[in-house]
């Protein structure tokens, strides 16, 4: 669970830091 939480936080941080990275994780956001 701890590792999963860390991954979620890391993904969220990277997503906010780089829109391109977040777009790759969530292609739906690109459409909208």
Curated annotation (Swiss-Prot):
InterPro entries per the UniProt record, alphabetical: Calcitonin/adrenomedullin, Calcitonin_peptide-like, IAPP
Database matches in SMART domains: CALCITONIN
Biological processes per GO annotation: amylin receptor signaling pathway
Annotated Gene Ontology cellular component terms: extracellular space
One GO molecular-function entry: receptor ligand activity
Family named by the database record: Belongs to the calcitonin family.
Protein name stated in the entry: Islet amyloid polypeptide
Organism, scientific name: Saguinus oedipus (Cotton-top tamarin)
